[in-house]
Amino acid sequence: MKYSKIPVARSVVALCVAKDIKHVVISPGSRNAPLTIGFTHHDEITPYSIVDERCAAFFALGLAQELKKPVALVCTSGSALLNYYPAIAEAYYSDIPLVIISADRPIERIDIGDGQTIRQKNVFENHILYSANLYSELVLENQSQDPKLQQKQFEAQKHNEREVNLALNKAIEEKGPVHINVPFYEPLYDTVENINVNPLQIFPEIKERHYSEKQLQNYANEWNRAERKMVIVGVAQPNAVEQKFLEGLATDPSVIVLTETTSNLHQEQFFTRIDTLIGPIEKDENREELFNRLQPDILLTFGGMIVSKKIKSFLRNYSPQHHWHIDSKKAYNTFFCLNKHFETDVNSFFSEFFPLTKRTESDYGSFWKDIKGKRQHRHEDYMAEIPYSDLKAMQEIYQKIPKNSVLHFGNSSTIRYAQLFEWDKSLKIYCNRGTSGIDGSVSTAVGASVSSEEPVTIITGDLSFFYDSNALWNNYIPSNFRIIILNNNGGGIFRILPGNKNSENFEKYFETTHNLKAKPICDLYNFDYEKANSEEEIQKVMKDFYSESGKPKLLEIFTPRKINDEVLLEYFNFMKS
């Protein structure tokens, strides 16, 4: 095996391997050659080569999300590093561990006019868990050199080893992005046959906080007194909560549990479609009475970001007396009423809290569960009669997604349409809701498909797909990967939002209408291409869309541009009856 002659490069590789960080996504460059040589020649590393750094970073994010362990990114100096930023922000807000390793020039070469050089030190400081800024190391050919120089080299090496340890441990312990900036002197391509470093290892400490009965008793008393308790679950990994706790919540008549498509939690009594519950009340002449009846005494939340704007608006206007959030790292005051953060994981909290609670008699659960059942019937009636549109196309897709597969959604219309359906509980569902951007949804799904044991599908809008079409520019996409595009010739989400829709400025600067089609991209990247222009054509194509194939497939569904907002808004009017 070959490794860089530069000791710090060998130490970075050795420590990544020691901490089980063995998937490394590399973008080509020269300054990062010492790292690339080491990672690509190590037999325990799985390297990936992806040219576009923005796509590479989201690819790594999808890998890490699926593997549930850190993935490393390696790039050259200069603006290459900045292209990682959108994915780093997503990882930061979604608690996904990424290790960004950037090559740099020595500090004395910064801001003197050297090429491909920017200020890389702490460049991500607002959205990073840890920034490790390493020292440059000289390659000492002759051990009899000046002892002062050798001492300086020794101190630099110890500093570097400590910083790399701290960064990697932070990614492992707290599940988020970290940045290691490694400046290199030339020559960059000299190699040695053995890794020949034994860096200091500082082992990560996974800290678990536990609450005593004394600490929880007052909260348990409040819980037991409350006749209206609402639990909301944001983004979560599949099987994140033990089933016995879900059943305990479901059987308490004073509790209703609201989940989202990305919550990956399933229990028959839960409200899986928040907007179908809230949206019709907004249109109801008795909305004040109904919202007062829905207003909880206690709001308990866990999981990541919430998609539904309707639940945010409701709880900001009808605040609970208490809002408690469970998360080992952070608690966002999403509803403007947070008054307790339980800094622990959900299962630990429930195991300590539930023994102190009791069943509370109330009609809160039964009242809203009755409405839930009625809404389901209205949903079925409405879907049976609507014209061909984005919503109708989503219904056809919903009915054909194979069980036991992984499903990704793009931002922003597709995930909001998805929220109106009750997806099969065997599916693992993801969407980049940390920052809710359109910039990396396809790349994330591609990364997930590489490491997933189940087939992966992404359902996305046209703008989100075309924005991230470089996601297909790599050699790792499996043949069972599927892309479904809802192409309504622009940003259809803006037709749903307030504003004047009948102006040239709206179409040009908000909706950004276009006539692009995905077939040329499929030809370029060797995807099978299918298209559909009607409900019947979708049904026909979907029959064989998931059949075994020699290459990945893309289905482009063309939908009307101007009818979708009317169909969606009328959905909530129809549901209130």
Swiss-Prot record:
Pfam families: TPP_enzyme_C (PF02775), TPP_enzyme_M_2 (PF16582), TPP_enzyme_N (PF02776)
E.C. number: 2.2.1.9
InterPro entries assigned: MenaQ_synth_MenD (IPR004433), MenD_middle (IPR032264), THDP-binding (IPR029061), Thiamin_PyroP_enz_TPP-bd_dom (IPR012001), TPP_enzyme_TPP-bd (IPR011766)
Record CDD domains: TPP_PYR_MenD (cd07037), TPP_SHCHC_synthase (cd02009)
Cofactor stoichiometry and binding remark: Binds 1 thiamine pyrophosphate per subunit.
One annotated GO biological process: menaquinone biosynthetic process
Pathway field: Quinol/quinone metabolism; 1,4-dihydroxy-2-naphthoate biosynthesis; 1,4-dihydroxy-2-naphthoate from chorismate: step 2/7; Quinol/quinone metabolism; menaquinone biosynthesis
Gene3D superfamilies, A to Z: 3.40.50.970, TPP-binding domain
Keywords recorded for this protein, A-Z: Magnesium, Manganese, Menaquinone biosynthesis, Metal-binding, Thiamine pyrophosphate, Transferase
Swiss-Prot/TrEMBL cofactor(s): Mg(2+); Mn(2+); thiamine diphosphate
GO molecular-function terms, A-Z: 2-succinyl-5-enolpyruvyl-6-hydroxy-3-cyclohexene-1-carboxylic-acid synthase activity; magnesium ion binding; manganese ion binding; thiamine pyrophosphate binding
Family statement drawn from the similarity comment of this UniProt entry: Belongs to the TPP enzyme family. MenD subfamily.
Subunit structure: Homodimer.
Record protein name field: 2-succinyl-5-enolpyruvyl-6-hydroxy-3-cyclohexene-1-carboxylate synthase
